[in-house]
Protein backbone atom coordinates (compact mmCIF):
# COMPACT_ATOMS: atom_id res chain seq x y z
CA UNK A 1 0.00 0.00 0.00
CA UNK A 2 1.24 3.51 -0.75
CA UNK A 3 2.38 5.73 2.08
CA UNK A 4 0.59 8.83 0.77
CA UNK A 5 -2.69 9.79 2.44
CA UNK A 6 -5.72 11.79 1.37
CA UNK A 7 -5.15 14.37 4.10
CA UNK A 8 -5.04 18.05 3.21
CA UNK A 9 -2.11 19.76 4.92
CA UNK A 10 -2.49 23.39 5.94
CA UNK A 11 0.56 25.53 5.32
CA UNK A 12 2.03 27.76 8.00
CA UNK A 13 4.21 30.82 7.46
CA UNK A 14 3.13 31.38 3.87
CA UNK A 15 5.67 33.51 2.02
CA UNK A 16 5.59 35.64 -1.10
CA UNK A 17 6.72 33.60 -4.08
CA UNK A 18 6.82 36.35 -6.68
CA UNK A 19 10.54 35.75 -7.17
CA UNK A 20 9.79 32.18 -8.31
CA UNK A 21 8.54 31.85 -11.87
CA UNK A 22 5.45 29.90 -12.87
CA UNK A 23 6.10 27.69 -15.93
CA UNK A 24 4.69 28.78 -19.29
CA UNK A 25 1.42 26.89 -18.96
CA UNK A 26 -2.23 27.96 -19.17
CA UNK A 27 -5.60 26.40 -18.45
CA UNK A 28 -6.00 25.33 -22.07
CA UNK A 29 -3.32 22.73 -22.87
CA UNK A 30 -0.98 23.59 -25.73
CA UNK A 31 0.28 20.47 -27.50
CA UNK A 32 3.30 22.20 -29.04
CA UNK A 33 4.45 23.58 -25.68
CA UNK A 34 3.90 20.16 -24.10
CA UNK A 35 6.05 18.45 -26.72
CA UNK A 36 8.76 21.09 -26.39
CA UNK A 37 8.78 20.83 -22.60
CA UNK A 38 8.93 17.03 -22.76
CA UNK A 39 11.80 17.10 -25.26
CA UNK A 40 13.69 19.67 -23.18
CA UNK A 41 13.32 17.76 -19.91
CA UNK A 42 14.29 14.42 -21.48
CA UNK A 43 17.24 16.12 -23.16
CA UNK A 44 18.40 17.50 -19.82
CA UNK A 45 17.90 14.17 -18.05
CA UNK A 46 17.60 11.12 -20.35
CA UNK A 47 17.30 8.83 -17.30
CA UNK A 48 13.83 10.14 -16.34
CA UNK A 49 12.03 7.13 -17.91
CA UNK A 50 14.16 4.87 -15.69
CA UNK A 51 12.80 6.41 -12.48
CA UNK A 52 11.40 3.74 -10.10
CA UNK A 53 7.69 3.89 -9.40
CA UNK A 54 6.72 5.15 -5.93
CA UNK A 55 6.61 2.44 -3.27
CA UNK A 56 3.43 0.36 -3.52
CA UNK A 57 2.40 1.57 -6.97
CA UNK A 58 1.82 -1.25 -9.51
CA UNK A 59 3.73 -1.59 -12.76
CA UNK A 60 0.41 -2.14 -14.56
CA UNK A 61 -3.25 -2.38 -13.57
CA UNK A 62 -5.49 -5.12 -14.95
CA UNK A 63 -9.19 -4.28 -14.62
CA UNK A 64 -12.36 -3.74 -16.61
CA UNK A 65 -11.89 -0.08 -15.65
CA UNK A 66 -8.88 -0.01 -18.00
CA UNK A 67 -10.23 0.83 -21.45
CA UNK A 68 -9.82 3.05 -24.50
CA UNK A 69 -12.51 4.81 -26.49
CA UNK A 70 -11.85 2.52 -29.45
CA UNK A 71 -12.86 -0.46 -27.31
CA UNK A 72 -16.50 0.68 -27.47
CA UNK A 73 -18.24 0.23 -30.81
CA UNK A 74 -21.79 1.42 -30.19
CA UNK A 75 -23.55 3.51 -27.55
CA UNK A 76 -25.94 0.63 -26.90
CA UNK A 77 -23.04 -0.79 -24.86
CA UNK A 78 -23.37 1.97 -22.26
CA UNK A 79 -26.87 3.46 -22.72
CA UNK A 80 -29.78 2.04 -20.70
CA UNK A 81 -33.14 3.04 -22.20
CA UNK A 82 -35.98 3.52 -19.73
CA UNK A 83 -39.20 1.71 -20.61
CA UNK A 84 -42.70 3.20 -20.46
CA UNK A 85 -43.42 1.13 -17.34
CA UNK A 86 -40.27 2.43 -15.66
CA UNK A 87 -41.16 6.03 -16.52
CA UNK A 88 -44.61 5.48 -14.99
CA UNK A 89 -42.93 4.08 -11.88
CA UNK A 90 -40.79 7.23 -11.62
CA UNK A 91 -43.92 9.37 -11.94
CA UNK A 92 -45.60 7.39 -9.15
CA UNK A 93 -42.51 7.90 -6.97
CA UNK A 94 -42.77 11.67 -7.50
CA UNK A 95 -46.38 11.64 -6.33
CA UNK A 96 -45.48 9.41 -3.37
CA UNK A 97 -42.73 11.79 -2.27
CA UNK A 98 -45.04 14.82 -2.49
CA UNK A 99 -47.52 12.98 -0.28
CA UNK A 100 -44.87 12.72 2.45
CA UNK A 101 -44.49 16.50 2.67
CA UNK A 102 -40.70 16.30 2.88
CA UNK A 103 -37.92 18.61 1.71
CA UNK A 104 -36.04 17.59 -1.44
CA UNK A 105 -33.03 16.74 0.70
CA UNK A 106 -34.92 13.71 2.04
CA UNK A 107 -35.10 12.00 -1.36
CA UNK A 108 -33.87 8.45 -0.82
CA UNK A 109 -34.66 4.85 -1.70
CA UNK A 110 -37.27 4.73 1.06
CA UNK A 111 -39.01 7.99 0.16
CA UNK A 112 -38.73 7.58 -3.62
CA UNK A 113 -39.77 3.94 -4.15
CA UNK A 114 -38.84 2.28 -7.44
CA UNK A 115 -39.75 -1.39 -6.89
CA UNK A 116 -38.75 -2.66 -10.35
CA UNK A 117 -36.38 0.06 -11.61
CA UNK A 118 -34.52 0.19 -8.29
CA UNK A 119 -32.80 -3.21 -8.69
CA UNK A 120 -31.81 -2.24 -12.24
CA UNK A 121 -30.20 0.94 -10.92
CA UNK A 122 -28.36 -1.03 -8.24
CA UNK A 123 -27.00 -3.30 -10.96
CA UNK A 124 -25.88 -0.26 -12.95
CA UNK A 125 -24.20 1.02 -9.79
CA UNK A 126 -22.14 -2.16 -9.68
CA UNK A 127 -21.15 -1.46 -13.28
CA UNK A 128 -19.67 1.83 -12.10
CA UNK A 129 -17.53 0.22 -9.42
CA UNK A 130 -16.67 -3.15 -10.93
CA UNK A 131 -17.37 -2.81 -14.65
CA UNK A 132 -16.60 -0.14 -17.23
CA UNK A 133 -17.13 2.73 -14.77
CA UNK A 134 -19.85 4.69 -16.59
CA UNK A 135 -23.36 4.49 -18.06
CA UNK A 136 -26.05 6.75 -19.52
CA UNK A 137 -29.69 6.51 -18.44
CA UNK A 138 -32.00 7.55 -21.29
CA UNK A 139 -34.29 9.41 -21.26
CA UNK A 140 -36.47 11.33 -18.80
CA UNK A 141 -39.32 13.53 -20.10
CA UNK A 142 -37.92 16.84 -18.87
CA UNK A 143 -40.77 18.96 -20.25
CA UNK A 144 -43.37 16.97 -18.31
CA UNK A 145 -42.10 18.16 -14.92
CA UNK A 146 -41.32 21.35 -13.05
CA UNK A 147 -37.68 22.14 -12.35
CA UNK A 148 -38.27 21.24 -8.70
CA UNK A 149 -39.62 17.83 -9.68
CA UNK A 150 -36.70 17.33 -12.06
CA UNK A 151 -34.35 17.83 -9.11
CA UNK A 152 -36.45 15.38 -7.09
CA UNK A 153 -36.29 12.75 -9.85
CA UNK A 154 -32.56 13.30 -10.23
CA UNK A 155 -31.98 12.89 -6.49
CA UNK A 156 -34.37 9.96 -6.21
CA UNK A 157 -32.85 7.97 -9.06
CA UNK A 158 -29.31 8.83 -7.92
CA UNK A 159 -30.04 7.49 -4.45
CA UNK A 160 -30.18 3.97 -5.93
CA UNK A 161 -26.83 4.42 -7.67
CA UNK A 162 -24.92 6.26 -4.93
CA UNK A 163 -27.00 6.84 -1.78
CA UNK A 164 -24.66 9.33 -0.07
CA UNK A 165 -24.62 12.79 -1.62
CA UNK A 166 -21.46 14.89 -1.41
CA UNK A 167 -21.15 18.62 -0.90
CA UNK A 168 -20.44 20.66 -4.03
CA UNK A 169 -19.34 23.84 -2.26
CA UNK A 170 -18.49 25.32 1.13
CA UNK A 171 -22.13 26.32 1.66
CA UNK A 172 -23.11 22.65 1.64
CA UNK A 173 -24.94 22.55 -1.69
CA UNK A 174 -25.21 19.08 -3.20
CA UNK A 175 -26.31 20.16 -6.68
CA UNK A 176 -24.44 22.43 -9.09
CA UNK A 177 -25.53 23.92 -12.39
CA UNK A 178 -23.38 23.92 -15.53
CA UNK A 179 -24.53 26.96 -17.46
CA UNK A 180 -23.04 29.69 -19.62
CA UNK A 181 -23.01 32.91 -17.58
CA UNK A 182 -20.66 34.82 -19.87
CA UNK A 183 -23.48 36.86 -21.41
CA UNK A 184 -25.04 37.85 -18.08
CA UNK A 185 -22.02 38.30 -15.80
CA UNK A 186 -19.11 40.77 -16.00
CA UNK A 187 -16.22 39.40 -18.04
CA UNK A 188 -13.84 39.44 -15.08
CA UNK A 189 -16.13 37.73 -12.58
CA UNK A 190 -16.11 34.13 -13.84
CA UNK A 191 -13.40 31.89 -12.42
CA UNK A 192 -14.54 28.46 -13.57
CA UNK A 193 -15.02 26.97 -17.07
CA UNK A 194 -18.32 25.33 -16.05
CA UNK A 195 -19.95 28.77 -16.35
CA UNK A 196 -18.75 29.55 -19.88
CA UNK A 197 -19.03 27.97 -23.31
CA UNK A 198 -15.29 27.32 -23.08
CA UNK A 199 -14.07 23.79 -23.59
CA UNK A 200 -13.41 22.08 -20.26
CA UNK A 201 -10.18 20.15 -20.08
CA UNK A 202 -9.92 16.69 -18.55
CA UNK A 203 -10.31 16.73 -14.77
CA UNK A 204 -11.84 14.77 -11.93
CA UNK A 205 -14.70 16.01 -9.76
CA UNK A 206 -14.74 15.38 -6.04
CA UNK A 207 -16.68 12.24 -5.15
CA UNK A 208 -16.70 8.51 -5.81
CA UNK A 209 -19.51 8.79 -8.36
CA UNK A 210 -20.27 11.88 -10.46
CA UNK A 211 -23.49 12.35 -12.43
CA UNK A 212 -24.85 14.87 -14.94
CA UNK A 213 -28.45 15.60 -15.96
CA UNK A 214 -28.95 17.13 -19.42
CA UNK A 215 -31.83 19.61 -19.36
CA UNK A 216 -31.39 20.47 -23.04
CA UNK A 217 -29.63 19.13 -26.10
CA UNK A 218 -26.78 21.41 -27.11
CA UNK A 219 -27.38 23.53 -30.22
CA UNK A 220 -23.72 23.09 -31.08
CA UNK A 221 -21.13 20.68 -29.71
CA UNK A 222 -22.31 19.13 -26.46
CA UNK A 223 -20.22 15.96 -26.58
CA UNK A 224 -18.84 15.09 -23.15
CA UNK A 225 -15.58 13.17 -23.28
CA UNK A 226 -14.57 10.71 -20.57
CA UNK A 227 -11.39 8.70 -20.21
CA UNK A 228 -10.08 5.83 -18.10
CA UNK A 229 -7.59 7.23 -15.58
CA UNK A 230 -6.38 3.66 -15.03
CA UNK A 231 -5.51 3.37 -18.74
CA UNK A 232 -3.64 6.68 -18.53
CA UNK A 233 -1.79 5.39 -15.48
CA UNK A 234 -0.69 2.24 -17.31
CA UNK A 235 0.75 4.33 -20.14
CA UNK A 236 2.63 6.60 -17.74
CA UNK A 237 3.90 3.71 -15.63
CA UNK A 238 5.26 2.04 -18.77
CA UNK A 239 6.84 5.06 -20.47
CA UNK A 240 7.21 7.87 -17.91
CA UNK A 241 7.28 6.54 -14.33
CA UNK A 242 8.96 9.78 -13.27
CA UNK A 243 5.66 11.56 -13.90
CA UNK A 244 3.88 9.01 -11.70
CA UNK A 245 6.37 9.97 -8.98
CA UNK A 246 5.68 13.66 -9.60
CA UNK A 247 1.91 13.15 -9.39
CA UNK A 248 2.25 11.14 -6.17
CA UNK A 249 4.23 13.92 -4.45
CA UNK A 250 2.65 16.97 -2.74
CA UNK A 251 1.37 19.81 -4.94
CA UNK A 252 0.43 23.34 -3.86
CA UNK A 253 -3.32 23.51 -4.53
CA UNK A 254 -4.45 27.11 -4.93
CA UNK A 255 -7.09 28.29 -2.48
CA UNK A 256 -7.73 31.47 -4.51
CA UNK A 257 -7.71 33.82 -1.54
CA UNK A 258 -8.86 31.34 1.10
CA UNK A 259 -7.22 30.82 4.48
CA UNK A 260 -4.84 29.06 4.24
CA UNK A 261 -3.94 30.37 0.77
CA UNK A 262 -3.06 26.87 -0.42
CA UNK A 263 -3.12 23.26 0.67
CA UNK A 264 -0.54 20.61 -0.07
CA UNK A 265 -1.40 17.11 -1.23
CA UNK A 266 -0.59 14.57 -3.96
CA UNK A 267 -2.82 14.25 -7.00
CA UNK A 268 -2.33 10.50 -7.35
CA UNK A 269 -2.82 7.72 -4.79
CA UNK A 270 -2.83 3.95 -4.74
CA UNK A 271 -4.83 2.67 -1.79
CA UNK A 272 -6.59 -0.65 -1.15
CA UNK A 273 -5.61 -1.92 -4.61
CA UNK A 274 -7.29 1.06 -6.24
CA UNK A 275 -5.80 3.93 -8.17
CA UNK A 276 -7.24 7.32 -7.22
CA UNK A 277 -6.51 10.53 -9.08
CA UNK A 278 -7.99 13.81 -7.85
CA UNK A 279 -7.20 16.99 -9.71
CA UNK A 280 -8.55 19.95 -11.66
CA UNK A 281 -6.14 21.88 -13.84
CA UNK A 282 -7.32 25.39 -12.93
CA UNK A 283 -6.00 25.02 -9.36
CA UNK A 284 -2.49 24.96 -10.84
CA UNK A 285 -2.85 27.29 -13.84
CA UNK A 286 -5.70 29.60 -12.86
CA UNK A 287 -8.65 30.45 -15.12
CA UNK A 288 -9.94 33.86 -16.28
CA UNK A 289 -10.91 35.88 -13.17
CA UNK A 290 -8.99 33.53 -10.88
CA UNK A 291 -5.34 33.47 -12.02
CA UNK A 292 -2.79 31.38 -10.13
CA UNK A 293 -2.11 33.19 -6.83
CA UNK A 294 1.27 34.92 -6.58
CA UNK A 295 1.71 34.33 -2.84
CA UNK A 296 1.93 30.55 -3.12
CA UNK A 297 4.61 28.27 -4.59
CA UNK A 298 4.47 28.07 -8.40
CA UNK A 299 4.26 24.63 -9.93
CA UNK A 300 7.48 23.08 -11.25
CA UNK A 301 8.44 22.22 -14.81
CA UNK A 302 7.94 18.54 -13.94
CA UNK A 303 4.45 19.29 -12.64
CA UNK A 304 3.63 21.32 -15.76
CA UNK A 305 4.67 18.40 -17.95
CA UNK A 306 2.65 16.00 -15.79
CA UNK A 307 -0.50 18.14 -16.13
CA UNK A 308 -0.20 18.30 -19.91
CA UNK A 309 0.65 14.61 -20.21
CA UNK A 310 -2.42 13.68 -18.17
CA UNK A 311 -4.60 15.75 -20.47
CA UNK A 312 -3.24 14.60 -23.80
CA UNK A 313 -3.17 10.91 -22.84
CA UNK A 314 -6.73 11.17 -21.51
CA UNK A 315 -7.72 12.81 -24.78
CA UNK A 316 -6.04 10.06 -26.80
CA UNK A 317 -7.87 7.28 -24.94
CA UNK A 318 -11.19 9.11 -24.53
CA UNK A 319 -14.77 8.24 -25.46
CA UNK A 320 -17.34 10.83 -26.50
CA UNK A 321 -20.81 10.71 -24.93
CA UNK A 322 -23.43 12.54 -26.98
CA UNK A 323 -25.86 13.71 -24.30
CA UNK A 324 -29.49 14.15 -25.25
CA UNK A 325 -32.18 16.10 -23.45
CA UNK A 326 -33.32 14.06 -20.46
CA UNK A 327 -30.19 11.88 -20.20
For each feature predicted by the language model, list its residue ranges.
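Active-site environment of non-heme Fe oxygenases that use a 2-His-1-carboxylate facial triad
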Residues: 2-117, 122-123, 130, 135, ...
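Classical protein tyrosine phosphatase
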Residues: 151
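Catalytic palm subdomain of template-directed nucleic-acid polymerases
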Residues: 147
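A short alpha->loop->secondary-structure connector
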Residues: 154-164
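Contiguous, non-catalytic segments that form substrate-binding/exosite surfaces or channel walls
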Residues: 165-170
Amino acid sequence: MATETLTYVKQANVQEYKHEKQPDISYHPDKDKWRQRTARRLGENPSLPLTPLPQGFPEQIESSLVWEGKDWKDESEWVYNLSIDQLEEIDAAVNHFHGLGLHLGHASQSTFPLPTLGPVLRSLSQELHSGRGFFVLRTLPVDSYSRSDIVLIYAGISSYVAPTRGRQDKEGGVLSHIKDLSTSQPAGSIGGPAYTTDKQVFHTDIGDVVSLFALETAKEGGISRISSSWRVYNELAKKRPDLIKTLAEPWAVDGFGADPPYTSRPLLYYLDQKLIIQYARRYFTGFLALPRSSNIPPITEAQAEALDTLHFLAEEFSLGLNFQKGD
